[in-house]
Amino acid sequence: MLTSSQAVESLNKICSDLSPKQVEEYFVPLTIRLSKADWFTSKVSGCGLYTAPYKKVSPQIQEQLRQQFNTLVRDDTPMVRRQAATNMAKFVKEMPAAIVVEEMIPMFQHLAGDDQDSVRLLTVEILISIAEVVPKEQQSSHGVLLTSLRSLIEDKSWRVRYMIADRFEKVQPPHVGVSADESKLTRYCRLPRPSTRKSSRGILSRRSSSSSKTTKPKFERP
């Protein structure tokens, strides 16, 4: 898999030097072919080839790429879904907010409800990316994000809860549109899993330190 990862990285570097026409004629067909292959290893490689060509191709080809990526998100093999989740965080940043809301948020929700915690934990980064792309004033989509955030916070898997605790400063406002919820972190500090408690306490400690540095002393008039 290391060789495959290095090959994907090399292909993406090559893509940056290709013209839009070359990307449409050679790179995109390669991406689609790998994504439709019978072997999951080929699909895993294909997952990493969507971000680099996206902005270089026509709207019609972009739509084709999104549709094919959707099939990877819903693949039967957990390894493929994991790789799709890993790359989706970068992929959504290439798109306008309207497309993210209409097409990518449903994909995110599908992954966030996956039966494998190894897939669900990767959706934390996707949540952060989506919330950065979608304007704050689009309350309907942020309502979906907030619901997903709460589900991840209360996930049955400690690995997912740990990931949320570790990235809490990123998933809290202004990104997701809710006020900072210290009680959630405080509750995490009492969870039985040591790693989750440690991560949460670290965040609370950093917040306390930051607050003490920014708080100015008050002086009374004589």
Q: For each of these PLM feature ranges, what is it?
A:
Residues 5, 9, 25, 44, ...:
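Alpha-solenoid HEAT/ARM repeat scaffold
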Residues 1-2, 40-41, 78-79, 98, ...:
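Alpha-helix N-cap/helix-start positions at coil->helix boundaries
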Residues 8-11, 28, 47-50, 66, ...:
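Residue-level signal for cytosolic alpha-helical hairpin/rod architecture
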